[in-house]
């Protein structure tokens, strides 16, 4: 049985297809609520869930070596660097990663990355990044994409993070996060998408963060913004 988030149709990129998929996801959530079920039950259908609890198992960053593709940028590498980077740390000074990500903001910061679901669930991955509000202490579990060369749709991002946080909503608020200028950023600002009633409904289910950044001498100074506080539209 195909899992909702793994449906290839969710990544169709035309605006017409994106709007149709947003309607599909929104209708599924509404139907669960109307039937008195947990909102995101349908996202877990077809998964085998064990009672064994997951525990984060990644070690502290030990720096990227010269022979380990230092110019390769992946979601995991970005999130790990956002979580650990400090220009004062010896491993960061010795790290060969071509671009290092340094938080230049005050309100939000990366608190953890690659967080597993509460229980082992077959074929369900990990939460990319935990974003923490430095003022309130609220933590957001965020699905994040690369700044460039990533065509994932907003619907797929929302479906993924709602899948990963099912059963963890007492700890994390689900969110999506994208970089300024990315494909997802442009989709979010698209007039037809942002005015769609189903998309507006989905935005009541997740928070939205966007990242602005500047790069100088291999250091990416980034700031995490909350769309509710600093609206893009």
Predicted regions located by residue number:
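Charged, terminal alpha-helix-loop-beta segments
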Residues: 1-233
């Amino acid at each position: 049985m195909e899992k909702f988030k793994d449906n290839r149709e969710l990544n169709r990129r035309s605006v017409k297809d994106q709007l149709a998929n947003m309607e599909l996801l929104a209708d599924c959530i509404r139907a669960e609520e109307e039937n008195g079920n947990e909102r995101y039950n349908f996202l877990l259908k077809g998964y085998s869930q064990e009672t064994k609890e997951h525990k984060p198992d990644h070690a502290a960053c030990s720096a990227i070596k010269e022979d380990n593709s230092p110019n390769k940028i992946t979601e995991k590498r970005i999130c790990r660097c956002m979580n650990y980077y400090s220009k004062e740390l010896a491993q960061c000074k010795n790290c060969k990663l071509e671009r290092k990500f340094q938080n230049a903001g005050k309100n939000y910061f990366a608190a953890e990355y690659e967080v597993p679901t509460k229980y082992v669930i077959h074929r369900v991955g990990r939460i990319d990044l935990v974003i923490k509000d430095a003022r309130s202490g609220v933590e957001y579990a965020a699905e994040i994409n690369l700044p460039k060369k990533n065509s994932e749709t907003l619907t797929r991002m929302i479906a993924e993070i709602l899948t990963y946080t099912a059963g963890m909503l007492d700890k994390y608020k689900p969110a999506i996060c994208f970089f300024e200028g990315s494909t997802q950023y442009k989709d979010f600002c698209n007039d037809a998408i942002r005015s769609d009633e189903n998309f507006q409904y989905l935005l009541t289910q997740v928070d939205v963060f966007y990242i602005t950044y500047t790069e100088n001498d291999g250091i990416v100074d980034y700031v995490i913004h909350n769309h509710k506080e600093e609206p893009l539209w």
